Structures are given as structure tokens and as C-alpha cells.
Design a protein with these regions (language model features):
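Cytosolic, long alpha-helical scaffolding segments
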Residues: 1-75
Length: 75
């Protein structure tokens, strides 16, 4: 169905934009963390959390790319 395929592609594009935004936010947060957090233990904990969030957003983008490929292949 063309409308469903178009909607899926639009959603995939939005996910790609959101992942790029998340990358920028993560870089900024990481920079601020190293500049401003005096407690080394807190830096280590937050850095690990930020990296996990980055992994999650990357995986979401990977799924969107797979869906996009499937939609394009079948349209």
C-alpha cells in the first residue's frame, strides 16, 4: 500500500533526524560532564549511561534503516 510505505519512510527519516540530534546532545553532555563534574566516580557513572543511551539511539536508527530498505525493496 503506497500510503503506508510513504508513512513508514517518513517515520524512518524522522528517526534518522532524531538520532543525529541525540548525537549532538550526547557530545554536548559529555563535554559538559568532563568540564564541570569534579567527582570522578560520578563522571564514570554518567559517561557509562551516556554511552548506553548512544548505543540505544544507534540501534533505533539501525532498525529504521532496515525498515526503510524493506519498504524500498517492496515498492
Amino acid at each position: 500500500e503506497p500510503a503506508a510505505a510513504e508513512a513508514a519512510l517518513k517515520t524512518c527519516e524522522e528517526i534518522d533526524k532524531l538520532e543525529s540530534d541525540a548525537d549532538r546532545v550526547m557530545r554536548s553532555a559529555m563535554s559538559k560532564l568532563f568540564r564541570e563534574e569534579p567527582d570522578v566516580r560520578e563522571v564514570i557513572k554518567l559517561k557509562a549511561i551516556y554511552e548506553l543511551l548512544e548505543t540505544i539511539t544507534d540501534k533505533c536508527e539501525d532498525v529504521a534503516n532496515l525498515i526503510e530498505g524493506i519498504v524500498l525493496e517492496n515498492s
